[in-house]
Amino acid sequence: MVSGCSNSAAPTLSPSESLPGGETSVSSQPFASFQLPAGNLPQALHPDFHAGKALAHQPWVRAPTITTARDGLGPIYNARSCLFCHINGGRSQMPESPDQELIGPFVRISIPGKDKIQGVVPEPIYGDQLQTQSVALSHQLRQVSQLKKVSLKAEEVKPEAYIYIDWQQSTFTYPDQTQVNLRWPKPRITKLAYGELNPDTMFSLRNSPPIHGTGLLELIPQSAIDDLADPQDDNGDGVSGRVNQVWDFEQARTVAGRFGLKANRANNLRIVTAAAFAGDVGITNPIFPQQPCTEVQTRCLKTANGNGEDGMEIPSNLLSLVTDFLRNIGVPKRSNWNSESVLAGRELFHQSGCQLCHHPDFTTAESSQLPHLSRQKIWPYTDLLLHDMGPALADGRPDYQASGSEWRTPPLWGVGLREAVNGSNNLLHDGRARTVEEAILWHGGEAEQVKQHFVNLKSAQRQLLIEFVESL
């Protein structure tokens, strides 16, 4: 067992645990959503919140058009809008059939090497992300009609590739002989449009995470996260979380990473938002002003853009609106948070050592710009640190200082509402886990001994622990 975790009693229950987002918490009734305004958002900010939400929803279109406020899509891209991937503010959905194209989730790529600024060395022809959509009319007809044999014309900008998922299967057997079917995705990349990939290309399939509570995560003091870091495992608990060091594209310097599945983005939601616009939608902006085309994609580079007078497809003020929409999304309140079974599961969660990475609570810092998010007691259940999760979950693709087997601990708040929010039950970085139980069973590396504690619980105890996680 992990040293000290099997005898770690849960702390005294706090009434604040019913409100994971503090005063920002919102009801999940009658309809669950991860895109509602924070419960304490001042009325004066509601118009901007809804304007930002509309911008996040709006589908961008090919330039040039008369709708100049939202033209400039692509020319190659993965999604037409922010919330196309983050459906209702939640996770994107993985394709279940091997004949269904990957749309929403995406594949990051790079080649071996280090780059202080980008964090990875992009593949020379295709960059650091495979764009599976394009503004080509033939491609659009192919998508709408599902006529997969429609051919793109020679003069049209082609999507970089089409991607499908072949699910691999295995069975996990508990000591009590209970069996669980597990699966993992194997991307199948077809119709590479611009030549062969570098033979050393590394691939990482990514499922889009939920976006609620990000403004609160942004306000967690870095010192509180640093206090949880233990890169050399000096305390001997078997867990050695560490902080990634990444490039801040606004400050032009290296800073602590916080956002992204490998904590590969700085603690600045404006940068996170701008990167998604540029890489996923193909929309140039003040932070990432380049089109998503590489040097060899000449037709892509020559395609008309939607740049305004400032040379950007989304200007600074509109980028800020979308960023503030993300910052001000409320966190759902918990239900049945103090029921007998949930409290029993809470005790088992701590006894098993889950809290060593899924750190329960923080208090946000003071912010004159965001006073309603300041000094909030929050319960996200994450330490926002990198942890080695073992070979089964490794993508083999380093990012800044994160290794190919390290991932940032994802927050657990709202995980039990995933089905109600948008029907997506795709957990973990690549959407392989369909249940909380499956997600736990995929844990390895630093979490292996904690997983073994869970595995060796009685079946009824395992269900109690899962019920607690689902209650978050």
Mark where each language-model region is.
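Periplasmic c-type cytochrome electron-transfer domains
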Residues: C5-L472
